[in-house]
Amino acid sequence: MTLNKTDRIVITLGKQIVHGKYVPGSPLPAEAELCEEFATSRNIIREVFRSLMAKRLIEMKRYRGAFVAPRNQWNYLDTDVLQWVLENDYDPRLISAMSEVRNLVEPAIARWAAERATSSDLAQIESALNEMIANNQDREAFNEADIRYHEAVLQSVHNPVLQQLSIAISSLQRAVFERTWMGDEANMPQTLQEHKALFDAIRHQDGDAAEQAALTMIASSTRRLKEIT
């Protein structure tokens, strides 16, 4: 995907914040300095600030400019923020927090999917699974299929309130998948088997097996995340 100038500056400044060049509570350079540094206009820098505010990485203070927000206010459900944090430093507390959220949400989704999935839902899940199998050596295509797989499982629950959380859930999953993809023979067959086990449990309307399959999947990805972080 081609990034425009605004996106590139957002990534640069976002990483600088997360990686500690600008610490929480400290000011970012003034607009004029950033315009000179990135050879761009004030309008572009203001767009960048809006994007960083949406990620809750900065706060704007009247007449004073942009300041780095406290770390506990950062939007960890933003895929970019989570990726930048994970690539910068191993934080066992963050890994634990991510696992807690997934363990809380995904097994329940799996159980409800087993109870409620229609034939059309099953076809969507199976289609995504087949794409994962077909693209198991293509990191980007595999991860996109993996996200579609989990989104299809979530959609099969038919809970409109839960579906409103799908963006947040998918952001968390996407950040994890981007870091834990392993195409080697020691990991990929297990990953595919775990996804097939969940699909089979949903297809057979076995809520207990679906819940256990989700827990197994989370445990595996958490293990891989700890190994590489």
UniProtKB/Swiss-Prot annotation:
Listed result of changing R102A: Shows a decreased binding to both DNA and D-galactonate
Q: Which keywords appear in this protein's UniProt record, sorted alphabetically?
A: DNA-binding, Metal-binding, Repressor, Transcription, Transcription regulation, Zinc
Q: Mutating T191M leads to what result? A: Completely non-responsive to D-galactonate. Does not affect binding affinity for the dgo operator
Boundaries of every HTH gntR-type domain copy: 1-71
What phenotype has been reported when the gene encoding this protein is knocked out? Deletion of the gene leads to faster growth of E.coli in D-galactonate and results in a considerable increase in the expression of dgo genes.
Tell me the outcome of changing D7A: Loss of DNA-binding ability and repressor activity
* Keyword flag Magnesium: no
Per UniProt, what is one GO molecular function of this protein? metal ion binding
Q: Which Pfam families match?
A: FCD (PF07729), GntR (PF00392)
Question: According to the UniProt record, what happens if one changes W181A?
Answer: Shows no significant effect on the binding to DNA and D-galactonate
Q: Does the keyword Transcription regulation apply?
A: yes
Q: What does this protein do?
A: Involved in the regulation of D-galactonate metabolism. Represses the expression of the dgoRKADT operon by binding to two closely spaced inverted repeats in the cis-acting element, which overlap with the D-galactonate responsive dgo promoter. Employs a derepression mechanism using D-galactonate as a specific effector molecule.
**Subunit structure, per the record?**
Homodimer.
Name the PANTHER family for this protein: GALACTONATE OPERON TRANSCRIPTIONAL REPRESSOR, TRANSCRIPTIONAL REGULATOR, GNTR FAMILY
Designated name of the protein: Galactonate operon transcriptional repressor
List the source organism.
Answer: Escherichia coli (strain K12)
Native organism taxonomy: Bacteria, Pseudomonadati, Pseudomonadota, Gammaproteobacteria, Enterobacterales
